[in-house]
């Protein structure tokens, strides 16, 4: 992160990532034949061992696999045959995470919407983006399955700050 002189940051607010606001979309909760289900979104090869361990842990549960990385269309049929959800439409992923009971991922932006929708998530990553969880008061998202508390208050404070700039 770059520290800017105060003259450049007069109207800055050190708030939560905008993805923590997806719950305001009011996406429906949908019961399916898989409900409840766990999402495994482990894409990095260095985390495949973790993915296999999670598959064993949840073998008695309904598991849905998702894939976020851009993909060549030649690879899509292979992913789909293996039961992996892939999409060009972010809403598909948001609906998936809205209705999951738990999400285990090495992608920050699989965990954030899950938490915003009130579900539990755990992150397997050392990305600098982990800092996004600190402002949301969930710094231990890499150590255990977590949920978020006080999200509405954090959202309201950030919205109030932005509204004050428009007055």
Residue ranges: model-predicted function:
Residues 1-167:
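Active-site anion-handling motifs in enzyme catalytic cores
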